[in-house]
Amino acid sequence: KTEQKKEFQTFEEFKDAKLGVLTGSEYDRLTKELFPDSEKFQFADVANLILSLDADKIDGFLLDSAYYSAVGWEREGYKSIQSDNTTVSYAFMLSESGMAKKVKGELDEFITDMKSNGGIETLAEKWLSGRKPTEFEDYSTLSGENGILTVAVSNSDMPLSFVSEDIARGFDVEIMIAFAKEYGYKLNFAPVDFEAKLGGI
């Protein structure tokens, strides 16, 4: 957050700062590794991290570029300090029961195809470019001839998955919608808090 009282310019200046951490995330490990002497505060989601930053309860927090691209959707006055020293990987997690093995194979194939045909880049431009999208994919009319997939989504992890007006939206959500269209599934999105995702699976 940019303010008159203190403006951090480098990673090193955060070494003894008050830092927010997304509970159970890779940022927890990275914060401990990069800033072992900092004071750390746990938060359930990115929205509460930002609110605490606004209230001066924390000085900052680690966030990947995907999440940061949505910070400016509703608010202004923030800055980021870029670092190429760390990377965070993403994946879709499936349970080991039911038709998960079949779905995993299909999803792996579909994402590989999206990477080669430009589908991922199109969604990235829509969701990760810093501009708030105004048009969304409709998943209410999916055919479902091959079954129904229940998909856990975060309530407020913009721009990847979040719920707005009782509708699931986001980069991850639209990947799943495109997948369901291609393979004949219907989607039941189940909003959960971040820490409840694994339990739901």
Predicted feature descriptions by range:
Residues 30-33, 47-87, 196-199:
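A ligand-binding cleft/hinge motif common to bilobed small-molecule-binding domains
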Residues 39-42, 46, 51, 122, ...:
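Extracytoplasmic small-molecule ligand-binding "clamshell" domains
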